[in-house]
Amino acid sequence: MRLKGLSSALVLAGVFCVTAANATVPVKGHPDTPGQSADRVPNGRGWGVDPAGPTGRAKPGGNGISYHGGPIMLNTVGVYYIWYGNWSGNTATSILGDLAGNIGGSPYFRINTTYKNGSNQFVSGNVAFLGSTTDSYSQGTSLSDTAIRTVVTNALNAGLPRDANGVYFVLTSADVTASSGFCTQYCGWHTHASIGGTDIKYSFVGNPDRCPSACEQQTTSPNGNAGADGMASIVAHELEEAVTDPDLNAWYDNRGYENADKCAWTFGTTQTAPNGSQYNMTLGSRQYLIQRNWVNASGGYCAVSYP
């Protein structure tokens, strides 16, 4: 998920500058339209990059996003949390636990049921919160991408189930950063890797209390914990992208934007909570401010519920 306030135009301008600086990178042809540059592909962090090689042939759906042939996550998707760092006494564990326990089957998450695979099988829209564990700084306080994968591997080796239909979230406390660009390039990301012979989908989401101006929508929040409430929207963003584009080769547009990227930092109609903060949905007994997601129907549009 890209930073707050970083517009699509700025993201693309920055990527094009990098491409121009690397004169050895060829301009690739579009697989469907000769003479047109190729679709960019997602990097799981909120913007697209040039494909390193041949990509799946896009099947335009007329809804502003195309299917590229890769798998999607069917049936009930498992969510697993790895609480990295120091979360002692922090209400984030209950706020985000309640999010994972109630987002499945909600009008919000049913937006993802508008996505299907090449066999005409649709995302179910069901989610189950299946487990969590803690990691007290095993990889230090500045995590490389490799270290984040190691955190996931260690959690699996320590007892979390190896679930090919699950998404594992590495949730870091505010004293932890990610050296590849947390707070400077992104607020969260998702990817996948073969771990112990299983295709594991996992995500990094940092605590936006570390950089409120970049990764928090508001500093007063409906659950009284701005960092956790900010993480809730980022977790939702990465979860819906992992479900519809788990291996970064399924659903995205010609800029390399996945479904949630297309609606990042937009929230639709909001209401005011008693403490003055804004929220746009209720999941279980809690109010949340969660970004909109892209509906893959009726021409495509951002929404907080479907149908």
Where are these regions (language model features)?
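Bacterial N-terminal signal peptides that target proteins for export
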Residues: M1-A9
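Bacterial N-terminal signal peptides
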Residues: S8-C17
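Loop/turn elements at helix/coil->beta-strand transitions in domains of secreted/extracellular proteins
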Residues: N75-V79, S106, D163-Y168, T198-K201, ...
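Active-site recognition of the HExxH zinc-binding catalytic motif
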Residues: S233-D245
